[in-house]
Amino acid sequence: MLLAGVMFAGAATAQPKTSDKAMWKSARKMAKTLADEGWKIDGSRSMEEMLYNHYQKLNDENNQELIANVIGNTSVKTMNQGQQWAQINAATTYAKQAKMMVVGRITNETGAGIEGAPSVDSFYEGYESQVVTEIKGELKKSFSLYREKENGGIDYKAFYLLNEASASQARIRAMERAMLESEFARANAARISEFVRNGFSIENEE
């Protein structure tokens, strides 16, 4: 089984600078919580070190965190399967939120009466589907965890970073493709482009 090649590292790591002590403390606390839940690091570095490095990157205001879980009935047999499903889950989660953000802005702009119009619904569905495709290449995996199950499978959790500048370009590409199938979107291209360009805060599921 692939898990045989995965280690939980316990090697000592360099203590961070004094100014980063709060971040290091948070990383250690989160690492303990995750370890208590049975999670192990997929890699040779310690969980607290990977969390600390992850938190440092989140200090960049252009980066957001996206956490993907492959757990429960969707657990997998290998790490490669976990990685593939996690990326799909992350992209799907982001695309749903991107669509709902546009739905809300269009509804506020045009009124609720526009909802349900075939051309509008076609654009929403097409936009969500295209965002899934476009955003996959922009997701940068920070690190991942696994948890062995009694049935021989594993739960998998991946932590991604998403840069808003790259995400915005991905949303624009998705919008342009979705507009090809929507008369409503083509007629309102300028306003919809403005909505799509505006970023939003990602909501991660527990």
Please tell me what each predicted stretch does:
Residues 14-206:
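Domain-level marker for long, solvent-exposed, non-transmembrane regions
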